Amino acid sequence: MAASRRLMKELEEIRKCGMKNFRNIQVDEANLLTWQGLIVPDNPPYDKGAFRIEINFPAEYPFKPPKITFKTKIYHPNIDEKGQVCLPVISAENWKPATKTDQVIQSLIALVNDPQPEHPLRADLAEEYSKDRKKFCKNAEEFTKKYGEKRPVD
């Protein structure tokens, strides 16, 4: 299966290079189509926790994009209550087979670090982010402390 070969290669590259913002990567070698790991954001209000994500690759990968789901709750305008994320790089209309998983993860980390209220999945949080940033940051920080996972120690 071409998807498995490519994913094995991408996983090796990611593990070899070591992404400081994507840690504790877990992959069942028998099923390379599902990855889990921790997103470790740099910027407040998310820098006090880590967020578990799951990446599901279709059997048609790389010709179809992966889907990303947050398993850890996060207070973010671009991520809904079910953990679905609005990430342009993996939308069907923008996806390119040459895009690698590490690029997708970098885009996701950039989005978590810097919310895009103009493309919200949660309009209420986008409005709060745009109109009262201080309140948004306070709420997001409290939410992160309550639900976020422990950050890995180097």
Swiss-Prot record:
EC main group: transferase
Organismal lineage: Eukaryota, Metazoa, Chordata, Craniata, Vertebrata
Entry comment describing in which tissues the protein is expressed: Ubiquitous, with highest expression in testis.
Domain UBC core, chain residue ranges per copy: 2-149
Species per Swiss-Prot/TrEMBL record: Homo sapiens (Human)
Family according to the record: Belongs to the ubiquitin-conjugating enzyme family.
GO biological process, alphabetically ordered: cell cycle phase transition; cell population proliferation; cellular response to glucocorticoid stimulus; cellular response to steroid hormone stimulus; positive regulation of protein targeting to mitochondrion; positive regulation of protein ubiquitination; protein K11-linked ubiquitination; protein modification process
Subunit structure and binding partners: Interacts with PRKN; involved in ubiquitination and degradation of misfolded proteins. Interacts with UBE3A; used by the papilloma virus HPV-16 E6 protein to ubiquitinate p53/TP53. Interacts with CCNB1IP1, CBL, ZAP70, RNF19A, RNF19B and RNF144B. Interacts with ARIH1. Interacts with ARIH2 (via RING-type 1). Interacts with NCOA1; they functionally interact to regulate progesterone receptor transcriptional activity. May interact with NR3C1. Interacts with NDFIP1 (via N-terminus); the interaction mediates recruitment of UBE2L3 to ITCH and causes MAP3K7 ubiquitination.
GO cellular component: cytoplasm; cytosol; nucleoplasm; nucleus; ubiquitin ligase complex
Subcellular location, principal: nucleus
Entry protein name: Ubiquitin-conjugating enzyme E2 L3
Gene: UBE2L3
Reactions that this protein is recorded to catalyse: S-ubiquitinyl-[E1 ubiquitin-activating enzyme]-L-cysteine + [E2 ubiquitin-conjugating enzyme]-L-cysteine = [E1 ubiquitin-activating enzyme]-L-cysteine + S-ubiquitinyl-[E2 ubiquitin-conjugating enzyme]-L-cysteine
EC number: 2.3.2.23
